[in-house]
Amino acid sequence: MAEQSDEAVKYYTLEEIQKHNHSKSTWLILHHKVYDLTKFLEEHPGGEEVLREQAGGDATENFEDVGHSTDAREMSKTFIIGELHPDDRPKLNKPPETLITTIDSSSSWWTNWVIPAISAVAVALMYRLYMAED
């Protein structure tokens, strides 16, 4: 069932997909498409455990992080059984927040340049005053 026309798309709810999280029925989501990887578990080059950890949920981020080859991406199309229901797409887990804060692209330039520049000037002046006392 590699290629599906828009008319024949089968939609699955997140609740349905989450029930298929064991070795006898292993489904996962990649880019809102639902894959039945049950028959592929033993053939997966990274081992069956990798797939089973993601079973019943969204594996998109992990799939992309690994950097799968073009061949792997083409092969994955043969396991598509449908798509995640559009109403459930917003429910997908967002990546967990980390302790590392990232600078928001909307933050102003002064927080990135002016504050460090002023700090550097202050340190330079303090050094100069300290050296002038000697």
UniProtKB/Swiss-Prot annotation:
Recorded hits in InterPro entries, A to Z, give: Cyt_B5-like_heme/steroid-bd, Cyt_B5-like_heme/steroid_sf, Cyt_B5_heme-BS, Cytochrome_b5
Sequence positions bearing N6-acetyllysine: 10, 19
**Superkingdom, taxonomy of origin:** Eukaryota
What is the name of this protein? Answer: Cytochrome b5
Query: In its keyword annotation, does this UniProt entry include Membrane?
Result: yes
Which sequence ranges are marked TM in the entry?
109-131
Q: List every position bearing N-acetylalanine.
A: 2
What organism does the record attribute this protein to?
Homo sapiens
